């Protein structure tokens, strides 16, 4: 018999302790992983609702189970808000993740063995854009494009490779690139060879929704995103298009269900609906502009302190600190900063001589600190502390001093005030 007063603390104290410890970690650590963010209590309320009990295979109005009249309302709200947010005429909000959204696009548009042009993972791409260890690299013939010596996407190389290999699909988007992508140029190249243009905007979806980064939806045949990261919603995925192609939309829907998934997670879709509504508010635009402002402020300090930033700066929410030539690996930098309650991730940089498990760089992003209320002043102060540690990563006194400063700053800017 279920009762409303059932709780984890009494029933499963071991699990409850882990949850409490993670909650404390989030409050007492500065989160700089570019793909992480804090979602709102409203989103978490939706995810913790009784919608989690409902199976709803199919799509609104076309379900395989009864009793779906209310979850149809929930999913329709999410769909319509996603379309409004990004200027799309089609949205599928069922993908459980960004990677599953991407796999659905591959399934809808390609056959195994087809040629795909995607950004090199070592140059800032994503696993699902053709990495040999991922389904994309195993099932398809991947031709990687990259960045030039300035750290910017090399569109001349992209066009040359496209003309030479004639891929059926080109992929735009990234996981560690700090520049602006020219979506119109990519579409021009795709049209030249008769290829689909697929954009994975997961990292910059929030910036795009707020109008502070170019929107790929008018240019691409299909666009995917996660719903967390800069969008600050629940962990999940979404597929969008403005191609006005009903045949394409049917292929995409079929590739999600029944092609790759069964029942959608209705409680997560409710969380997506809330997040999309939040992203339509004026304050969301203010937040996203501050995300970019904070990233630029951090880059300024890194450069002043003599650190190299891949591409020399940032136009979005992230930066890649290049440690090649320094007596410090990305793994060591990650660990040293972590000891001071600053969370980053080690990351490969272009022409990295070290393995992906060690790396010669760290990736840093500003969505989470901006969500806490950091502005340029705090971002610059924090970057100075990071440089202090990177300058002397084996010095416990420096790490302990910075940790104290971090704890004081976190106390001033609680995640959930």
Curated annotation (Swiss-Prot):
<dbReference type="InterPro" id="IPR049943">
    <property type="entry name" value="Ser_HO-MeTrfase-like"/>
</dbReference>
<comment type="subunit">
    <text>Homodimer.</text>
</comment>
<keyword id="KW-0663">Pyridoxal phosphate</keyword>
<feature type="site" description="Plays an important role in substrate specificity">
    <location>
        <position position="228"/>
    </location>
</feature>
<feature type="binding site">
    <location>
        <begin position="355"/>
        <end position="357"/>
    </location>
    <ligand>
        <name>(6S)-5,6,7,8-tetrahydrofolate</name>
    </ligand>
</feature>
<protein>
    <recommendedName>
        <fullName>Serine hydroxymethyltransferase</fullName>
        <ecNumber>2.1.2.1</ecNumber>
    </recommendedName>
</protein>
<dbReference type="GO" id="GO:0030170">
    <property type="term" value="F:pyridoxal phosphate binding"/>
</dbReference>
<comment type="pathway">
    <text>One-carbon metabolism; tetrahydrofolate interconversion.</text>
</comment>
<dbReference type="GO" id="GO:0004372">
    <property type="term" value="F:glycine hydroxymethyltransferase activity"/>
</dbReference>
<dbReference type="Pfam" id="PF00464">
    <property type="entry name" value="SHMT"/>
</dbReference>
<feature type="binding site">
    <location>
        <position position="121"/>
    </location>
    <ligand>
        <name>(6S)-5,6,7,8-tetrahydrofolate</name>
    </ligand>
</feature>
<dbReference type="InterPro" id="IPR015422">
    <property type="entry name" value="PyrdxlP-dep_Trfase_small"/>
</dbReference>
<feature type="modified residue" description="N6-(pyridoxal phosphate)lysine">
    <location>
        <position position="229"/>
    </location>
</feature>
<dbReference type="InterPro" id="IPR019798">
    <property type="entry name" value="Ser_HO-MeTrfase_PLP_BS"/>
</dbReference>
<dbReference type="InterPro" id="IPR015421">
    <property type="entry name" value="PyrdxlP-dep_Trfase_major"/>
</dbReference>
<feature type="binding site">
    <location>
        <begin position="125"/>
        <end position="127"/>
    </location>
    <ligand>
        <name>(6S)-5,6,7,8-tetrahydrofolate</name>
    </ligand>
</feature>
<keyword id="KW-0554">One-carbon metabolism</keyword>
<keyword id="KW-0808">Transferase</keyword>
<comment type="similarity">
    <text>Belongs to the SHMT family.</text>
</comment>
<dbReference type="InterPro" id="IPR015424">
    <property type="entry name" value="PyrdxlP-dep_Trfase"/>
</dbReference>
<comment type="pathway">
    <text>Amino-acid biosynthesis; glycine biosynthesis; glycine from L-serine: step 1/1.</text>
</comment>
<keyword id="KW-0028">Amino-acid biosynthesis</keyword>
<dbReference type="GO" id="GO:0005829">
    <property type="term" value="C:cytosol"/>
</dbReference>
<dbReference type="InterPro" id="IPR039429">
    <property type="entry name" value="SHMT-like_dom"/>
</dbReference>
<comment type="function">
    <text>Catalyzes the reversible interconversion of serine and glycine with tetrahydrofolate (THF) serving as the one-carbon carrier. This reaction serves as the major source of one-carbon groups required for the biosynthesis of purines, thymidylate, methionine, and other important biomolecules. Also exhibits THF-independent aldolase activity toward beta-hydroxyamino acids, producing glycine and aldehydes, via a retro-aldol mechanism.</text>
</comment>
<dbReference type="GO" id="GO:0035999">
    <property type="term" value="P:tetrahydrofolate interconversion"/>
</dbReference>
<dbReference type="InterPro" id="IPR001085">
    <property type="entry name" value="Ser_HO-MeTrfase"/>
</dbReference>
<keyword id="KW-0963">Cytoplasm</keyword>
<dbReference type="GO" id="GO:0019264">
    <property type="term" value="P:glycine biosynthetic process from serine"/>
</dbReference>
């Amino acid at each position: 018999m279920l009762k409303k007063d059932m709780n984890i603390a009494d029933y499963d104290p071991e699990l409850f302790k882990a949850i409490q410890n993670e909650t404390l970690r989030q409050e007492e650590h500065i989160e700089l992983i570019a793909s992480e963010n804090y979602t709102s209590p409203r989103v978490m309320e939706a995810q913790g609702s009784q919608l989690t009990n409902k199976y709803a295979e199919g799509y609104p109005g076309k379900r395989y189970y009864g009793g779906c009249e209310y979850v149809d309302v929930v999913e329709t709200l999410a769909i319509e808000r996603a379309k409004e947010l990004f200027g799309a005429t089609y949205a599928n909000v069922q993908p459980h993740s960004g990677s599953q959204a991407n796999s659905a696009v591959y399934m809808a548009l390609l056959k195994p063995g087809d040629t795909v042009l995607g950004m090199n993972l070592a140059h800032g791409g994503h696993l699902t854009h053709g990495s040999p260890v991922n389904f994309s690299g195993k099932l398809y013939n991947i031709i990687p494009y990259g960045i030039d010596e300035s750290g910017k996407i090399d569109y001349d190389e992209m066009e040359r490779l496209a003309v030479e290999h004639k891929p059926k699909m080109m992929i735009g988007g990234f996981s560690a690139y700090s520049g602006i992508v020219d979506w119109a140029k990519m579409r021009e190249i795709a049209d030249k060879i008769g290829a689909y243009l697929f954009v994975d905007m997961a990292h910059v979806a929030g910036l795009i929704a707020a109008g502070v980064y170019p929107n790929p939806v008018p240019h691409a045949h299909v666009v995917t995103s996660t719903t967390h990261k800069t969008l600050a919603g629940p962990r999940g995925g979404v597929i969008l298009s403005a191609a006005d192609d009903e045949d394409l939309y049917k292929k995409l829907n079929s590739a999600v269900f029944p092609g790759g998934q069964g029942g959608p997670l209705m409680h997560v879709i409710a969380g997506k609906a809330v997040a999309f509504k939040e992203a339509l508010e004026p304050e969301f635009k203010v937040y996203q502009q501050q995300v970019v402002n904070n990233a630029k402020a951090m880059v300024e300090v890194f450069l002043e302190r003599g650190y190299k930033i891949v591409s020399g700066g940032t136009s979005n929410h992230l930066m890649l600190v290049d440690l090649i030539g320094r007596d410090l690996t990305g793994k060591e930098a990650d660990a040293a900063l972590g000891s001071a309650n600053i969370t980053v991730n080690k990351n490969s940089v272009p022409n990295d001589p070290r393995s992906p498990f060690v790396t010669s760089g760290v990736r840093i992003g500003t969505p989470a600190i901006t969500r806490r209320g950091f502005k340029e002043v705090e971002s610059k102060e924090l970057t100075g502390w990071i440089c202090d540690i990177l300058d002397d990563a084996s010095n416990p006194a420096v790490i302990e001093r910075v940790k104290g400063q971090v704890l004081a700053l976190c106390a001033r800017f609680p995640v959930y005030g």
